[in-house]
């Protein structure tokens, strides 16, 4: 079975998808992390992000793998090096929409994504899972949330391993800054020519703003159980 969870940045896709996969014993595929990996690799190697041919070539060359770390964490490596934290920086946030819009990059990632789902139960999350990657997925969910709540979640995710927690003032200031970036990314993701961020016609819409993680997981697991 394939469960497709699409939605904008900060809607809770990664957290929800990870928990569903854990509870049901499914494999988890974070396609957004793959595009972040290409973006980080390009920035790290000093490749001009406007050089589409160079970015396309990079996407074909690098080896992106997901491996289990301690506990339930899934680690992402690029050519054998752990990049799990490096792909979640503001610099990557600001540039991943540009990189992921390149048709060559999407084509390279699509091959890996479909291969990962062969002969296994999988929870895949991203922006075009139900429309492009797995259009025949048995369960399709389009997950949304209030933009400011999404920005708050993204900031908390970014600082979850900090030794010193953010003050209330620091949190609100960073949320304001992140909200502007999220709105810009929403615009870019929704308007790109290749695989834009749009819900599949047969997707179930779930607004996670006022729900806990467990509540959203329960809603989606009910859908899965109905279609098994």
Predicted feature locations:
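Walker A (P-loop) ATP-phosphate-binding motif of ABC ATPase nucleotide-binding domains
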Residues: 2
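Hydrophobic anchor at the beta1->P-loop junction of P-loop NTPases
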Residues: 5
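P-loop (Walker A) phosphate-binding loop of NTP-binding proteins
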Residues: 8
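Conserved lysine of the Walker
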Residues: 13
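Hydrophobic positions on the alpha1 helix immediately C-terminal to the Walker A/P-loop
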Residues: 16
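N-terminal phosphate/diphosphate-binding loop that engages ATP/GTP or pyrophosphate donors
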Residues: 22-90
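Small-molecule kinase domains that catalyze NTP-dependent phosphoryl transfer to phosphate-bearing small molecules
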Residues: 68, 113-120, 127-132, 136, ...
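ATP-dependent NMP and nucleoside kinases share a basic, alpha-helical "lid"
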Residues: 84-160
């Amino acid at each position: 079975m394939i469960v497709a969870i699409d939605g904008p940045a900060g809607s809770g896709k990664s957290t929800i998808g990870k928990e569903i996969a854990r509870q049901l014993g499914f494999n988890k595929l974070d396609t957004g992390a793959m595009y972040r990996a290409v973006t980080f690799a390009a920035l790290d190697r000093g490749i001009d992000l406007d050089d589409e041919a160079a970015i396309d070539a990079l996407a074909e060359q690098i080896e992106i793998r997901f491996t289990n770390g301690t506990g339930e964490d899934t680690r992402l490596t690029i050519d054998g090096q752990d990049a799990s934290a490096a792909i979640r920086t503001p610099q990557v946030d600001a540039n991943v929409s540009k990189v992921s819009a390149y048709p060559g990059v999407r084509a390279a990632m699509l091959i890996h994504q479909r291969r990962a789902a062969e002969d296994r139960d999988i929870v895949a999350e991203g922006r075009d899972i139900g429309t492009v990657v797995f259009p025949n997925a048995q369960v399709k969910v389009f997950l949304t949330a209030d933009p400011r709540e999404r920005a708050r979640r993204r900031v908390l995710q970014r600082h979850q391993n900090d030794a010193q927690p953010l003050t209330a003032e620091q949190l609100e200031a960073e949320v304001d800054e992140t909200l502007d970036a999220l709105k810009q990314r929403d615009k870019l993701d929704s308007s790109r020519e290749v695989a834009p961020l749009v819900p599949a016609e047969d997707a179930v819409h779930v607004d996670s703003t006022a729900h806990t993680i467990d509540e959203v997981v329960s809603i989606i697991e009910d859908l899965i159980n109905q279609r098994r």
